[in-house]
UniProtKB/Swiss-Prot annotation:
Protein name as catalogued: Periplasmic chaperone PpiD
Mode of membrane association: Single-pass type II membrane protein
Topological region Cytoplasmic: 1-16
Positions on the Periplasmic side per record topology: 38-622
Function: Chaperone that functions as a gatekeeper on the periplasmic side of the SecYEG translocon. Facilitates the translocation of precursor proteins across SecYEG by interacting with the translocating substrate. Also plays a role in the release of newly synthesized secreted proteins at the periplasmic exit site of the Sec translocon.
Chief place where the protein resides: membrane
GO MF, one annotated term: peptidyl-prolyl cis-trans isomerase activity
Pfam families referenced in this protein's UniProt entry, alphabetically: Rotamase_2, SurA_N_3
Highest classification ranks of the organism: Bacteria, Pseudomonadati, Pseudomonadota, Gammaproteobacteria, Pasteurellales
Gene that encodes it: ppiD
Keyword DNA damage: no
Superkingdom of this protein's organism: Bacteria
Transmembrane spans: 17-37
Source species of the chain: Haemophilus influenzae (strain ATCC 51907 / DSM 11121 / KW20 / Rd)
SUPFAM superfamilies named among the record's database cross-references: FKBP-like, Triger factor/SurA peptide-binding domain-like
Length: 622
C-alpha cells in the first residue's frame, strides 16, 4: 500500500527498491510534478514532457525537510556541504525522471483506477485500521500529519495505484522453478569440513629485517606513494544540548504551572463532521440541522468524506494539532453537543460537531510535561550561551579562551590531521569545509559558529597548517620498513605453504615442519564470519574420494592458511526452510527485474537534464 510506504518514510524506513522510492515520491511531492507550467524553465525533459524547475525545487525542499526531520543531526551536519547538496539534487531529479517514465508507461498501457478501487485501498490499508477494522480517526490523523485532505489523498492514489499495478505485475512475472531453488540452496547451505594450519603473518614479520639501503631504494622508486596531504592542527569549542541538559532540573511547581497554562494541549475531543465541496451545499445542510435533522443522517447522505460519512461523520477521539487549525479552532469554540456553522478549511466546507470532551490528568501527562519544560529550558540556555560564545569569539578573534568561558566549556585541541583522518568530534562536512577552505581560518582567526545538528554548535580555530608535500625519507621510514617486512613475510609464508601443499598432496601422512592442523571445522556460506577465508575454502574443488585436498588460502588478518578439505556435504533444508529460502531468492530476482524495468524505459527514452540548473547551489536559485 502507498500509505504504508509514506508511513515508513516518516519513520525513517526508506524503500530498498527504486520503484518503491518512486511510489513514495508521489506522497512526498503530491501531484505538483505533473502540473507543468509553460512559463518555467525546465529542470529535465522526458520524451518531450517537461519537469519544471519549480516542481523540482518543491520536491527538493520537501525531501530536504523530511530527511532533516528523520535523520536529525546527521543530516543537518551534511547539508552545508556542496558535494552533498549536489548529490541530493541529482538523486531528486533522477527520481522525478523515473517517476515520469513510469507515468508515461502507465498511459501507454492504458491502466486506470476506479473510485471503488480507491475506496477499497483506503479501508483495507492496515495503517488505517485498529484491531483489523478501518478507523476513520486514524485515517484523518495520518492525512493531517502529512498535510493531505481526503480528496487530495484520493487523487494521489489515483495516480499511484497504477504504478503499484506495474510493480506487482513485474514482480509476479518472475518465478523460480523448484530445481533452481534446490540447486541454489544446496550451494548456499553446503557444508565444507576442513582442517586449517594457520601461518601467522605478524609472527613472520617479527622475524624479518630490513636494511637502510632497502628502505632508501624503495623510497626513491616510489616517491608518489609518499605524497602527504595538507594537514592542520586546530583548537575548538563544542556546545551541545547534551552538556547543557545534564545540569537542568525541572520542579513539580514548573510542571503544574505548565499544565495549567496549556490545558488545551492535553484535551482530547470526540468529533464528527460533514464535508462539502462548496459553501452553498454546506448552508443548505446547516439549515436542515437547524430544523432538527439528525447530524449522523445528514453526514451519511451528504458528506463529501464518504469514509467518515458512512459512520455518521464520526472522526473518533482527536488530540490537539491532529487536524487543520481552522477545524480545531471551530471545535474549540463549541460546547459539547453543539455543531458549528459551515467553516472553510483548505477550500472545502465543514460543519463540526463536538460529541465529547475530556482532559487528561496531570499525573498521566507529568512525564511528558517534564520533557517539554526541560526542552524549553535547554533551548533558552543553549541559544543564550551560543550568542555569548559567538560574541566573545568575534571580540577576541585569535583565541577561544574567552568564548569557552562564556559557554562554560573547555577548549579542545587536536593533533595534526588531514581531510582523510578528521577526528570524530570535528568530522562534519561543514566543519571540514571551514577548516580547509575558509579564508577566516586560513589566517588563524576564530570561525563563526558552525551548526552541526539540532542544538549543536562548534567554533574552530586553526593553530597550524602543513602544506601538501612528499614525506621525507625519515618521515616515511617506519611505513616503508613495515611494508617491506610484510612483503618478505608474505613471500616466505606463501613459499612454505606451497611446499607443504605439494608434500601433503603426495603423501598425506607426511610431517611438515611448522604445519600444525587444527581439529576439523565446518564452513558454510550462510554463516560467513571471515569472507576471505570462507571464499577461499569454497574455491577448492570437491574431493572425489575420501582423500583430502590441500590448498593455500588467506584469512582476513593476512595470515597464510593451508587448508585440508576433507569432505563436502550438500546443504539440506526442511520444506519450511526451503520455502523461506525460495521467497528470499524470489524477492532478490524481483528486485533485479524492477531495476531492469527502469533501465529499459530509460534506454528507449529521450531524456534531457538541465545540468547547469541541477548543479547550481540553493542560494543561486533564491
Amino acid at each position: 500500500m502507498l500509505i504504508e510506504k509514506m508511513h515508513n518514510l516518516t519513520n525513517s524506513k526508506i524503500s530498498k527498491f527504486i520503484l518503491g522510492l518512486i511510489a513514495v515520491s508521489f506522497l512526498v511531492g503530491g501531484m505538483s510534478g505533473y502540473l507543468f507550467s509553460s512559463n518555467d524553465t525546465y529542470a529535465a525533459k522526458v520524451n518531450g514532457e517537461v519537469i519544471s524547475q519549480q516542481d523540482f525545487l518543491n520536491r527538493y525542499n520537501q525531501e530536504f525537510e523530511i530527511r532533516a526531520q528523520r535523520e536529525g543531526e546527521a543530516f543537518v551536519a551534511q547539508s552545508d556541504s556542496p558535494e552533498f547538496v549536489t548529490a541530493l539534487r541529482q538523486n531528486i531529479v533522477n527520481l522525478m525522471i523515473d517517476q515520469e517514465l513510469l507515468r508515461q508507461y502507465v498511459k501507454e498501457l492504458k491502466l486506470g483506477v476506479s473510485d471503488e478501487m480507491i475506496k477499497r485501498a483506503i479501508v483495507t490499508d492496515p495503517n488505517f485500521q485498529v484491531k483489523g477494522k478501518f478507523d476513520n480517526a486514524v485515517y484523518q490523523r495520518i492525512l493531517q500529519q502529512n498535510h493531505l485532505t481526503s480528496d487530495g489523498y484520493a487523487s494521489i492514489l489515483r495516480a499511484s495505484l497504477p504504478l503499484e499495478q506495474i510493480q506487482n505485475g513485474v514482480a509476479n512475472s518472475e518465478f523460480i522453478v523448484p530445481a533452481q531453488v534446490k540447486n541454489s540452496a544446496e550451494v548456499f547451505f553446503q557444508k565444507r569440513l576442513a582442517r586449517l594450519a594457520t601461518l601467522s603473518l605478524a609472527d613472520e614479520m617479527a622475524k624479518q629485517s630490513v636494511s637502510d639501503d632497502e628502505i632508501k631504494t624503495y623510497y626513491e622508486a616510489n616517491q608518489k606513494s609518499f605524497v602527504q596531504p595538507e594537514q592542520v592542527k586546530v583548537q575548538y569549542i563544542d556546545l551541545s544540548a547534551d552538556n547543557i541538559s545534564r545540569n537542568l532540573q525541572v520542579t513539580d511547581v514548573e510542571i503544574a504551572q505548565y499544565y495549567q497554562d496549556n490545558k488545551a494541549q492535553f484535551m482530547t475531543q470526540h468529533l464528527a463532521h460533514i464535508q462539502f465541496a462548496n459553501e452553498q451545499d454546506a448552508k443548505v445542510a446547516y439549515e436542515e440541522l437547524q430544523k432538527g435533522a439528525n447530524f449522523a443522517d445528514v453526514a451519511k447522505a451528504k458528506s463529501l468524506d464518504k469514509i467518515s460519512g458512512e459512520n455518521g461523520g464520526d472522526l473518533g477521539w482527536v488530540n490537539e494539532n491532529e487536524l487543520p487549525k481552522a477545524f480545531e479552532d471551530a471545535a474549540a469554540a463549541l460546547q459539547v453537543g453543539q455543531y458549528s456553522q459551515p467553516i472553510n478549511v483548505d477550500g472545502n466546507y465543514h460543519i463540526v460537531l463536538v460529541q465529547e470532551r475530556k482532559a487528561q490528568s496531570l499525573e498521566n501527562v507529568k512525564a511528558q510535561i517534564a520533557d517539554l519544560v526541560r526542552k524549553s529550558l535547554m533551548e533558552s540556555r543553549y541559544f543564550s550561551l551560543e550568542k555569548q560564545a559567538s560574541d566573545k569569539a568575534f571580540e577576541d578573534s585569535k583565541s577561544l579562551n574567552t568564548a569557552a568561558q562564556a559557554a562554560g566549556v573547555k577548549v579542545q585541541e587536536s593533533d595534526y590531521f588531514s581531510r582523510q583522518n578528521v577526528p570524530a568530534g570535528l568530522n562534519f562536512p561543514n566543519v571540514i569545509y571551514t577548516i580547509f577552505e575558509s579564508d577566516t581560518t586560513n589566517v588563524g582567526m576564530n570561525s563563526e559558529p558552525i551548526n552541526v545538528g539540532d542544538y549543536h554548535t562548534i567554533i574552530v580555530r586553526v593553530l597550524d597548517r602543513k602544506a601538501e608535500g612528499v614525506k621525507s625519507l625519515e618521515e616515511a621510514k617506519i611505513d616503508i620498513e613495515t611494508f617491506l617486512k610484510r612483503q618478505k613475510a608474505e613471500n616466505a609464508l606463501n613459499g612454505k605453504a606451497q611446499q607443504a601443499v605439494k608434500k601433503l598432496s603426495e603423501n598425506p601422512e607426511s610431517k611438515v615442519d611448522g604445519i600444525n592442523f587444527s581439529s576439523e571445522q565446518t564452513f558454510t556460506l550462510s554463516e560467513n564470519k571471515d569472507p576471505i577465508l570462507t571464499n577461499g575454502i569454497f574455491s577448492i574443488a570437491k574431493p572425489e574420494s575420501s582423500k583430502a585436498l590441500y590448498q593455500v588460502v588467506h584469512n582476513s588478518n593476512g595470515d597464510v592458511v593451508v587448508v585440508a578439505l576433507n569432505k563436502v556435504e550438500q546443504g539440506s533444508l526442511s520444506e519450511k526452510e526451503l520455502s523461506q529460502f525460495a521467497m528470499q531468492l524470489l524477492r532478490s530476482h524481483q528486485s533485479e527485474l524492477q531495476v531492469q524495468l527502469i533501465q529499459g524505459l530509460r534506454e528507449r527514452a529521450k531524456i534531457e537534464v538541465n545540468d547547469s540548473f541541477i548543479n547550481q547551489d540553493d542560494e543561486a536559485q533564491q
